[in-house]
From Swiss-Prot:
Family, similarity comment: Belongs to the class I-like SAM-binding methyltransferase superfamily. C5-methyltransferase family.
InterPro entries: BAH_dom (IPR001025), BAH_sf (IPR043151), C5-Methyltransferase (IPR050390), C5_DNA_meth_AS (IPR018117), C5_MeTfrase (IPR001525), C5_meth_CS (IPR031303), Cytosine_MeTrfase1_RFD (IPR022702), DNMT1-like (IPR017198)
Tissues where the protein occurs: Expressed in flowers, embryos and endosperm.
BAH domain: residues covered: 735-869, 909-1049
Full protein name: DNA (cytosine-5)-methyltransferase 1
Compositional bias segments (type: Polar residues): 328-341
Gene transcribed to yield this protein: DMT1
The species this protein was found in: Arabidopsis thaliana (Mouse-ear cress)
Annotated consequence of substituting G1465E: In met1-7; reduced activity
A Pfam family hit: DNA_methylase
Amino acid sequence: MVENGAKAAKRKKRPLPEIQEVEDVPRTRRPRRAAACTSFKEKSIRVCEKSATIEVKKQQIVEEEFLALRLTALETDVEDRPTRRLNDFVLFDSDGVPQPLEMLEIHDIFVSGAILPSDVCTDKEKEKGVRCTSFGRVEHWSISGYEDGSPVIWISTELADYDCRKPAASYRKVYDYFYEKARASVAVYKKLSKSSGGDPDIGLEELLAAVVRSMSSGSKYFSSGAAIIDFVISQGDFIYNQLAGLDETAKKHESSYVEIPVLVALREKSSKIDKPLQRERNPSNGVRIKEVSQVAESEALTSDQLVDGTDDDRRYAILLQDEENRKSMQQPRKNSSSGSASNMFYIKINEDEIANDYPLPSYYKTSEEETDELILYDASYEVQSEHLPHRMLHNWALYNSDLRFISLELLPMKQCDDIDVNIFGSGVVTDDNGSWISLNDPDSGSQSHDPDGMCIFLSQIKEWMIEFGSDDIISISIRTDVAWYRLGKPSKLYAPWWKPVLKTARVGISILTFLRVESRVARLSFADVTKRLSGLQANDKAYISSDPLAVERYLVVHGQIILQLFAVYPDDNVKRCPFVVGLASKLEDRHHTKWIIKKKKISLKELNLNPRAGMAPVASKRKAMQATTTRLVNRIWGEFYSNYSPEDPLQATAAENGEDEVEEEGGNGEEEVEEEGENGLTEDTVPEPVEVQKPHTPKKIRGSSGKREIKWDGESLGKTSAGEPLYQQALVGGEMVAVGGAVTLEVDDPDEMPAIYFVEYMFESTDHCKMLHGRFLQRGSMTVLGNAANERELFLTNECMTTQLKDIKGVASFEIRSRPWGHQYRKKNITADKLDWARALERKVKDLPTEYYCKSLYSPERGGFFSLPLSDIGRSSGFCTSCKIREDEEKRSTIKLNVSKTGFFINGIEYSVEDFVYVNPDSIGGLKEGSKTSFKSGRNIGLRAYVVCQLLEIVPKESRKADLGSFDVKVRRFYRPEDVSAEKAYASDIQELYFSQDTVVLPPGALEGKCEVRKKSDMPLSREYPISDHIFFCDLFFDTSKGSLKQLPANMKPKFSTIKDDTLLRKKKGKGVESEIESEIVKPVEPPKEIRLATLDIFAGCGGLSHGLKKAGVSDAKWAIEYEEPAGQAFKQNHPESTVFVDNCNVILRAIMEKGGDQDDCVSTTEANELAAKLTEEQKSTLPLPGQVDFINGGPPCQGFSGMNRFNQSSWSKVQCEMILAFLSFADYFRPRYFLLENVRTFVSFNKGQTFQLTLASLLEMGYQVRFGILEAGAYGVSQSRKRAFIWAAAPEEVLPEWPEPMHVFGVPKLKISLSQGLHYAAVRSTALGAPFRPITVRDTIGDLPSVENGDSRTNKEYKEVAVSWFQKEIRGNTIALTDHICKAMNELNLIRCKLIPTRPGADWHDLPKRKVTLSDGRVEEMIPFCLPNTAERHNGWKGLYGRLDWQGNFPTSVTDPQPMGKVGMCFHPEQHRILTVRECARSQGFPDSYEFAGNINHKHRQIGNAVPPPLAFALGRKLKEALHLKKSPQHQP
């Protein structure tokens, strides 16, 4: 639309069309034009013959304006100049770029839109309007509607006047900004015009307050009254000129607007304010936009001057400045609230002005050992600040980078851009006990008790806030990148710097008190408040001075704190009262610097810049080191983010010295908190997602109408299955088309690029048409890779089609690329790649056709990229694998009854009479029905496992057609223990079933699969946790009429499943069944040694991933790399055969590549090189080399990823610090057979998927097959919600593992990954509607563990009770002693709260009594933490905080630091008054009781919270083992 407009803009004008030749008639009343622009350039238009033809569609489209006017004319139109309504319009310049209306003063402006009759008419065709793709030029614009109080915007061309009604969606933001300016003008007019009841003699504060009230209603454009004030002031010049234009038509008794003092004052104030501009622009005409301070130095510019045209550059600069302001205001924001005088700006406190209120300079000194706060917390991805953990800080002090004490007042209370104040702090950190500081406390600077906590130094403080309540109580908190700290008492030395802040808070609260008692807050102006404060008694805590001037000075210099208190006050009338307007105005008048408030997401600086870091005995381990990479990984990521070489030493140095601040989400590299109500991963939920289930339908090809010579080249090679002759080559218009090559075809959609198809075979049809059958070659940018794809790489798909050779547009330069793979070929392939890149660049420079290549098959329905089936493609045999896949899918979707009517096929499964089957639980009613509950991590009521039945017979229906409605199936139901009672389920084996006489007839579509049911004595020897086999046992009979269980009667002889593998049976001992004690200690058969892969575990943690893979019999973790000492020690304790490197992986990779003689291929920092050189010879000797490592797995830390959405071409240095680059470089250098990446689920979606895409692109460039998916650990046998993203990579000749089947019911939806073109992929189905086994509950998991008290630290204990549940028996194994059943100590207040939380499901802080309690030290505290009720509405009621677990529910996501006020606040034992123990958390993750953890209790919780649940790792390992066996099978042998 805009492009067409740009073309139309260049047409020349000819005499006006006939529509102008009308008789003179009386003119209708036109709106008064204010500040209308009239002096413009001329531009001609030309009426072409084509305009006489109108194509009728849903809305008529014409190219010429006069035709649109003629088609929309009404019989009632009598005016000599037409007026029309204008909808769906865009205003743009001659280049087709959308422009604000005021740019008419600089450029020619044209219009595109739907022209409608001037009034609503009954003619439906005319009321639809006529779209004119480009018309104008716009001659001038005007605003009317002043008397009505609602602005009407008019634009005029030479032919007509247009009432602008509704802009196009793409133009709405631009137009809405201008409309709000018009609204402001009308609002000011109504307040000043006597004819409208206004008063031209009011003051500026009163005028602004009135305008705020007027504009607050009916507009979502402004987030607060303060934002409206800022906007009105900024547009003072515009408003003045609009009202000045009304003087010509003003009534005699009306005042001249140009002489109204308040309007002149508004204009002057507008010319003085700072209008921030973030950057200088140099437009094509050479105009340079100055910073605001520079503009302010020159004389104020008015619209009058602009109209005169005396200074085009200035005029253009001011209009561009206004456009910048619009863009700044329209930045998207979440949960915006009025946080200062404006949501756009924060006025900086001037240190010189407040210096007299503070003591003389002093410096921070301490003899205490302090720990870097970044060691205590982890953070990953972007997160809103309210989701950070909350702590208390006692005995604290704040200082700058020189350790000089500094006031908190100098730091903005909102997160802002370009802050030039660096404030750090130190103190004693404890858990947040919810305590407040009383304003009546006479000694706020002394510590009444010695806090029991850790001495820490903080990273840079980013913002702070004040909270206050009744009874003169106040709380002040500060935020760093990793936590919120509620401030307790400061240190004695810092107390003098603290008192002014508290005093200002008291003053603000006192002013609020003044206003609350007034019947109308508008009665108190700034002067009134100043007078009242000066009249306070000297003993009043808000007393400043008896001198009003001193009070005014204090209010203004400390005004930003007071404005913040008003901004968060819940009463809108108070927020925009005259006092606030007056104070904000006085702050503006002092010309304070403004900071722009930015989006509130947290950013982590890996290097703590606190000056204490260099002196602290506990050095920070969080120092960021640029990732060590191979050149291949460095190139892929570097080219994406930067155009310069990251290996340039000058730029590398600059990057190392620069700040490394990126946004991230709270948590750590592994930890992720699940939120309720999440239904997927995609951020854009407007379009309906389409899940990939089968290959796409072929694209619609545009047939060719041209005539070209087409003939076969060569003889026929054979025939298709239909007897049609096959050919190898054909000449199409002189171009050779060959089987195995590629051709381009035009598609119906003109916006799409030509489709490229791989030629499978060519044939001549029976009607003598020359045909081609091809498979679609997908461009990389249209796959999940997006912009990370190589523009020359195509991917074969399973989408195929047949078309005529005459439809071919051209022949593509294309090759199937196959290169030798393995670490020994890396250098050879690098050389070949360089030559290929050079050739491609040369062709691009010469504008030659692109040479495409294909290495992989892309299968979105399988979620991955696979090796090309080279033996099956391009054979010219008339056979197509894609067609076969489609035929198989069609067969799977149909039902087929066998001839004997004893079996049938459905969904690809063959069922026969006497088979044991799964039945959808919704198809068979349960004994007890329940409903799901809504509290966090609640009960599993309503979640039911599949019903196990035996197929007895097939019941035909009257219909003879074999479809879903032609027959039913009769089945016998087996009951599960949970069908009887919760107690029975708890004490029974999860694989146990009960025989019954109940039968039911069901449709075959109710069946979900097959399973086996055996006698208990026939169960396999290698039973293991977690379950991966569909095998059950049955020894008991359930009488549903009596609800009783008994041994199977002799007359009941169920026909159990036939056992095909006798090696899985237990060895019988006489006639009796093996005892339970003996069965528990039988060890599973050890898997063959040759199948275990030599594994390198990177970012190994305590070893959860390695443990599960090892248990699956597929991995031998010979090497592990872990940065944290306690975690590395835990890994070593549980994997004594492994060589564990407790070091930075960047250093280890550098050392390995040096050992292999490949340091030239290594991109690393000087620091990494030096540390690698310091490794001992013994350490170096144990380093693995390429060829020794078969499998690499790990979960790289994620901090900093989310910051990439802010990266530009100069931000490559920030990306280099990401550990995923090093992780991928290990894969590139070693080229193992298999590679597994694990991460939090948002890894695939944050940063618009760029990191995920680059990871896939890197692995594909190495030559790997790749697949991706998200799994829920709760569906694999743990009682915990933990969603994790995985990426498998396999060497080209290997088999990619499938995703493990979820075995347990768990209440989560499908976990989808966004692909492209609105498609989504889910690795596995959701088990919310059924699975083979029931969910594991909290009681199943920890019900047998002995009671412990709050703070119990005894590491070794006895079990005291026997294991009851199936899970408990499996998790205990042969362990005799219970270890790590220890819990964190809560402080006295939280312990009291815990004891008051009821021991019932769903109980949390909402159940606390609303009263106070006196602690042992005499302090009086509220039972309900103060911050929860005040902020509950914004945080889903803080559901789960101080929450108890439910015996029948599941655990929330395991975190590294369980606490009642943490991100996962549900951490109280279901019955005992304490936080969960280390062992209980370990069990929730599926760690066996024999697993050991290292370090103190915080280290152990951290190790567990960061770990991959071993049962999930086991399930992945089983599928890897299957893939290894599958490779050895005959069908996969070359």
